[in-house]
């Protein structure tokens, strides 16, 4: 580790700031004070990582989505689900490219609320640091990803509509015409209590999807 930044982190502004000393190589981006917060809670568990070979120009992108917080408690005590894909931009994986591009657009929108000055080469100095170069390379890699309009991404979020409202229409392009009678849910925590009734959220999903 030589002071470079390899990973940036965006958390809800109510979260305690994580210092680079506590986690070398990680930059916990600060929330802008002059921006309008357009969400009640930033609570997505999504990572978009790029990897490059040391001795060649070969690169690939990894998208990770999980149901649990990325903490030691989740790792050691909870039962959670993780979904991930690896995509080489030049390959003919149209579905994978649609997924990573949808996630990239999501991150770009969220980035507007955070201070990224340390990552960009926007000053008067002509010197570019390792961090500037890596950040520019990250965005350039996604600029080269082209997706056909007919391909529907499997990655989606609730910036414009609730997940419950979107789910029925988004599931259809990725399922067969045969009707299904099975629904699997994977949240980090489940509704409890003494009632024998089906929880309201699960019942709503059941009525809309099955």
Tell me what each language-model feature is.
Residues 1-210:
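PLD/PLD-like phosphodiesterase catalytic module centered on the HKD motif
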